[in-house]
Regions:
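Double-stranded RNA-binding/processing signature
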Residues: 1-200
């Protein structure tokens, strides 16, 4: 698979930083792409293709990273009275936008991001979104174990509440429990209930 030099260099640098080689280079390119103009166009295997923005991959990556982190929380057997506070703290300290931005910049992932023409500065939001998208792309490309290795490599599983975390492959039951816990913890904007005449 042949990329234009702009994406090829970024993909190679990203793979080196996260210590993971993608089977699908185009998936990694999408994770790194914030552009919607001509800067998102590349030549792929002789054909002109527009690489999608990374926002959807970022949503997926956020959920995947939270599910794996939740598995470490559950396997850690933290005391029940403090468990909810512990989970909130882990999410805030490890996979919040602020920490993802810090991790992304410290590892140099901000230099891999493809931006719109005329954009000269990589914002904090771009870095956090790109890292979420990278994690999502890794999970899609290599599965849950690949995601676990990349998160550990980037320090996204290092926390005093977890102690010294070793590599934990996710079994299916723990994965399902974690997805449920993550979904329950998310806060969605609630619409007011419609008032129907004759009903309370």
């Amino acid at each position: 698979m042949t990329f234009c030099p702009r994406f090829s260099r970024r993909v190679s640098e990203c793979e080196s930083i996260i210590a993971y080689e993608f089977n699908s280079k185009s998936l990694c390119a999408q994770a790194l792409n914030t552009a919607a103009d001509s800067m998102s166009v590349c030549v792929l295997d002789g054909s002109i293709k527009k690489i999608p923005k990374n926002d959807r991959l970022a949503v997926y990556g956020d959920a995947a990273a939270a599910a794996y982190l939740c598995s470490l929380w559950i396997k850690g057997g933290l005391p029940k009275p403090d468990s909810q506070d512990c989970w909130t703290t882990l999410r805030r300290d490890l996979i919040s936008n602020d920490n993802l931005t810090r991790v992304g910049r410290e590892h140099g992932l901000d230099k891999c991001i493809n931006m719109n023409g005329g954009t000269t500065r990589v914002s904090s939001g771009m870095v956090a979104t790109a890292l979420e998208a990278i994690l999502g792309a890794v999970e899609i490309d290599g599965g849950r174990d690949a995601l676990a290795r990349v998160m550990k490599h980037l320090g996204l599983t290092e926390h005093a509440l977890l102690g010294s975390v070793k590599f934990f492959p996710l079994d299916n039951l723990t994965h399902l429990i974690c997805i449920g816990a993550f979904s329950a913890a998310m806060e969605f904007p609630r619409r007011p209930r419609p008032v129907i005449p004759g009903f309370a």
